[in-house]
């Protein structure tokens, strides 16, 4: 059943690949059906990405870009030509990868999906502006509309028609009153009181007054239309295009304006434009925060880094005994306010703390300074305050280094002007359906979707908004269908996980409605709960049904079973991979003996449920109380120590907030003395059972090509020591530094140890070419002459972990670390492989290997965020073995995870939910997997029940 003979067809329904050798691909021939959902699976490092991204996508994209003019090409990224003999049947390609969308603080979910652009258009075309001061709508009315409004009042209501002539102006207005009398008017209303014109009291000329001319007094009846119309015309003439109808019995006022303005204060707006609602445009952004929604400020808690110390011993960095100039000021302050600089900061009176941090205001203080010559001199002036001093230095410095240092004492807070809305006042007071744009953007997507689906507009506004609303509701629907209903449009794109960012791009692609395209996706199910997986698969099928080829690199069992066609790569990783084991339907793959994927699908292999669970020790618990960051509802988290705990829950239920933003930061601050700011919580108990915390996340192990697994894990130092100890090295006087590619000496100076040289191409992307001097080996000729066991340092860096493990078998310091890299399934990566080429899952496993190789006390808390990212069934089995070893030493492991194979093997589960966003943030279930599987309201429990019974 395991044959995959390429069909020798030239039809239009097949993508034909012949002789693909990109990276570790072994000259493969493969036929993939077009317009189908194709899943590429296999072990980590087996060549899945090499096939899907570096061969199919790269060639599809390259051919499309090559068809454009040279001018257009300079704006597009050109892909390297893959090493392949032939590819036929390709369509233009779009890749949707796991990279987070943007590091730009101005990008939000709304801007990335372009929904915000449609919302701007909607608010500009059918929005109703209001006066920020009086909450009255800005709309111009004709005299007829004013008359109709009065006639709608109950019959016989007594109404006074007024012309608001003077608003908030100083003066006595004697001539004004005389002029009104000459025109035949009898009454005026001054500051709310009605007077006969000849009985108006003398007005105070330095106080602001409001004066209304009384035009008419009428009783509401059907036959007063003509009289009312004439009265309103007179009122508008005297009231600067404004008129006022006051009900005489209740005092209720009805304002009217013939101009597009507030009838009370004449506040007006020019015509509404879409850019007024853009926080990335000066016309729409809040002037205080420039549309970022938050401002930086010097946080007293960061400025006073060590409140348990005294001012003399370093409560505030830079203002203690070591800095004579600033400390003299503190001593003079202490003398003036009678406090002791040698007592702990936290015991000082509040008044003293306030003066030290914020200054003495206008109070003058005598300061005594010591000059460089040793003489003292006095100065009398107010004390600036430490925080104003930092603000001034931050403003005035030209040095980026100084700014960087000062930023350590800053924190973010919502902008005081716009409250985080990002928009200027005028835009915040325009309403559609009674709601302003910034409010609608802050709702969960489900609520926003419901609001626009049921939005009822009047008259021609309905017609104008029809097409815009269709686009908005469709796009919101696509986001909800890929399991992102808990997000909101104002959420910053920087805070999205890789999986969320990818699913947003996926939803945008469906929104674009393209057909005849080849989409290549990288594990779209990452970070997605089983419950939302069905919706994601339905979305992928919808892309396919539009007439596109959808190629997905995926390990999720449901995705593999639901695919039209499966390509299984293997059999091993790295050098041992790169072959197509089987390319067929999921049913046939499940019957294939030699395919590891097939063995798991067919049930021949599986990850076993432990026969017994490690019991919880009630005396060793970590208890976090009152966690309420983001959507958490005052959560109490109980973690049994010495066990493996899984934190589960649907996407957006609060797992990352609880673990990464709260628990990890508290423990890092308390145990590792890190400068962390956890999300709000009340209390934590049980830290005495731990001595350190290690957060093994998916951030890159280095951001430059110089970082690599060997340097990160500390392997490279003992390897360089071995080379420095070779007789020829000692003879030449070479030390360890000679074998570093980061410092002068042994490295090739032509490329400064990079191995490649960047060539700037104006019409094409920058090209990296191997260095002509060292031919990509990074070192100079003399250094490469030094050999250890017949290999030079460059050849060692080019070895895979597996090859190096054998090569350094007799060197325990090196082989132990290499063995741990193999244990986490990374035998295929090269020691000198650039960190920038490692996936998030690989980077996480390199970190895990580093921790495994350290000798530990058995009192460490390990935090892992979705460690199964990018892992095949067989890799997960390896990972669980490694985590089991950490537990075996007495350590505690907390894993945020959706993968049921990991969840079912945990000792303890804490399930958050029930839903995502506002509907989540509570602990729904806790206990062993068997206990959680019985809990009715838990989505995780429902799927876990099935997994435990397999």
Curated annotation (Swiss-Prot):
Keywords: ATP-binding, Cytoplasm, DNA damage, DNA excision, DNA repair, DNA-binding, Excision nuclease, Metal-binding, Nucleotide-binding, Repeat, SOS response, Zinc, Zinc-finger. One of its GO terms (molecular function) is ATP hydrolysis activity. Transmembrane segments: none annotated. Its main location: cytoplasm. ATP binds at residues 42-49, 649-656. A zinc finger (C4-type) spans 262-289, 748-774. The keyword Iron-sulfur does not apply. The keyword Kinase does not apply. One of its GO terms (biological process) is nucleotide-excision repair. The UvrABC repair system catalyzes the recognition and processing of DNA lesions. UvrA is an ATPase and a DNA-binding protein. A damage recognition complex composed of 2 UvrA and 2 UvrB subunits scans DNA for abnormalities. When the presence of a lesion has been verified by UvrB, the UvrA molecules dissociate. This is UvrABC system protein A.
């Amino acid at each position: 059943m395991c044959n995959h003979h390429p069909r020798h067809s030239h039809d239009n329904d097949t993508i034909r690949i012949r002789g693909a050798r990109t990276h570790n691909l072994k000259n493969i021939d493969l036929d993939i059906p077009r317009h189908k959902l194709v899943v590429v699976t296999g072990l980590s490092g087996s060549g899945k990405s090499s096939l899907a991204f570096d061969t199919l996508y790269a060639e599809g994209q390259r051919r499309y870009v090559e068809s454009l003019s040279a001018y257009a090409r300079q704006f597009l990224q050109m892909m390297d030509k893959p090493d392949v003999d032939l590819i036929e049947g390709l369509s233009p390609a779009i890749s949707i990868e796991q990279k987070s969308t943007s590091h730009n603080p101005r990008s939000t979910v709304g801007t990335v999906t372009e929904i915000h652009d449609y919302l701007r258009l909607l608010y500009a075309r059918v929005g109703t502006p209001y006066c920020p001061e009086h909450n009255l709508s800005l709309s111009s009315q004709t005299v007829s509309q004013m008359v109709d409004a009065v006639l709608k009042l109950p019959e016989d209501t007594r109404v006074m028609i007024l012309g608001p002539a003077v608003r908030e102006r100083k003066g006595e207005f004697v001539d004004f009153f005389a002029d009104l009398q000459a025109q035949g008017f009898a009454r005026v209303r001054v500051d709310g009181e009605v007077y006969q014109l000849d009985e108006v009291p003398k007005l105070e000329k330095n106080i602001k007054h409001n004066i209304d001319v009384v035009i008419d007094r009428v009783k509401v009846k059907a036959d007063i239309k003509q009289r009312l119309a004439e009265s309103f015309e007179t009122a508008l003439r005297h009231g600067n295009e404004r008129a006022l109808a006051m009900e005489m019995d209740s005092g209720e006022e009805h304002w009217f304006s013939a101009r597009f303005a507030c009838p009370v204060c004449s506040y007006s707006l020019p015509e509404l434009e879409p850019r007024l609602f853009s926080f990335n445009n000066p016309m729409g952004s809040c002037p205080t925060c420039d549309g970022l929604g938050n401002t930086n400020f010097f946080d007293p808690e960061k400025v006073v880094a060590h409140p348990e110390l005294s001012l003399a011993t370093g409560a505030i960095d830079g203002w203690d005994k070591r800095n004579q100039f600033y400390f003299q000021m503190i001593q003079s302050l202490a003398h003036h306010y009678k406090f002791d600089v040698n007592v702990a900061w936290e015991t000082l009176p509040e008044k003293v703390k306030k003066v030290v941090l914020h200054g003495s205001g206008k109070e003058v203080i005598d300061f005594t300074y010591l000059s460089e010559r040793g003489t003292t001199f006095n100065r009398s002036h107010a004390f600036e305050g430490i925080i104003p001093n930092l603000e001034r230095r931050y403003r005035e410095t030209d040095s980026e280094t100084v700014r960087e240092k000062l930023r350590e004492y800053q924190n973010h807070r919502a902008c005081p002007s716009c409250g985080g809305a990002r928009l200027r006042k005028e835009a915040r007071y325009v309403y559609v359906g009674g709601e302003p744009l910034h409010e609608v953007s802050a709702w969960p997507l489900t609520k926003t979707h419901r609001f626009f689906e049921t939005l009822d507009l009047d008259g021609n506004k309905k017609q104008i908004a029809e097409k815009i609303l269709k686009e908005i509701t469709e796009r919101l629907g696509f986001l909800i269908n890929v399991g992102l209903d808990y997000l909101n449009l104002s959420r910053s794109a920087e805070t999205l996980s890789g999986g969320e960012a990818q699913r947003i791009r996926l939803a945008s692609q469906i929104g674009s409605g393209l057909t005849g395209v080849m989409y290549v996706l990288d594990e779209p199910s990452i970070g997605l709960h089983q419950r939302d997986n069905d919706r994601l698969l339905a979305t992928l099928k919808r892309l396919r049904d539009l007439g596109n080829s959808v190629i997905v690199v995926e390990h999720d069992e449901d995705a593999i079973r639901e695919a039209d066609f499966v390509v299984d790569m293997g059999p091993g990783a790295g050098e041992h991979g790169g072959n197509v084991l089987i390319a067929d339907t999921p049913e046939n793959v499940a019957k294939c003996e030699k395919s590891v994927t097939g063995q798991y699908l067919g049930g021949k292999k599986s990850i076993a449920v432990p026969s017994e669970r490690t019991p919880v020790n009630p005396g060793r618990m970590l208890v976090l109380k009152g966690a309420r960051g983001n959507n958490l509802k005052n959560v109490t988290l109980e973690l049994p120590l010495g066990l493996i705990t899984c934190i589960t829950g649907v996407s957006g239920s609060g797992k990352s907030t609880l673990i990464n933003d709260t628990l990890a930061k508290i423990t890092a601050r308390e145990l590792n003395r890190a400068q962390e700011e956890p999300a709000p919580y009340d209390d934590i108990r049980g830290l005495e059972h731990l001595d350190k915390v290690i957060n093994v996340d998916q951030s890159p192990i280095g951001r430059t090509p110089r970082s690599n697994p060997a340097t990160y894990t500390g392997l490279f130092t003992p390897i360089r020591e071995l080379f420095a100890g070779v007789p020829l090295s000692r003879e030449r006087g070479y030390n360890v530094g000679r074998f570093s590619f980061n410092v002068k000496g042994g490295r090739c100076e032509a490329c400064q140890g990079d191995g490649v040289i960047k060539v700037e191409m104006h019409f094409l992307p920058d090209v990296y070419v191997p260095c002509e001097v060292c031919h990509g080996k990074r070192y100079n000729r003399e250094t490469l002459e030094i050999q250890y066991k017949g290999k030079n340092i460059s050849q060692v860096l080019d070895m895979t972990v597996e090859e190096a493990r054998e090569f350094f078998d007799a060197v325990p310091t090196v082989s132990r670390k290499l063995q741990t890299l193999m244990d986490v399934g990374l035998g295929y990566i090269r020691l000198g492989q650039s960190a920038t080429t490692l996936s998030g899952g690989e980077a996480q496993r390199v970190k895990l290997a580093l921790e495994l190789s350290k000798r530990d006390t058995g009192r460490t808390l390990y935090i892992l965020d979705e460690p199964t990212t990018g892992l095949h069934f067989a890799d997960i089995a390896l990972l669980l073995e490694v985590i089991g070893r950490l537990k075996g030493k007495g350590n505690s492991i907390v894993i945020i995870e959706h993968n049921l194979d990991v969840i079912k093997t945990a000792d303890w589960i804490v399930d958050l939910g029930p839903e995502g966003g506002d509907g989540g943030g509570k602990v729904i279930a806790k206990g062993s997997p068997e206990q959680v599987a019985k809990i009715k309201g838990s989505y995780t429990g429902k799927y876990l029940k099935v997994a435990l019974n397999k």
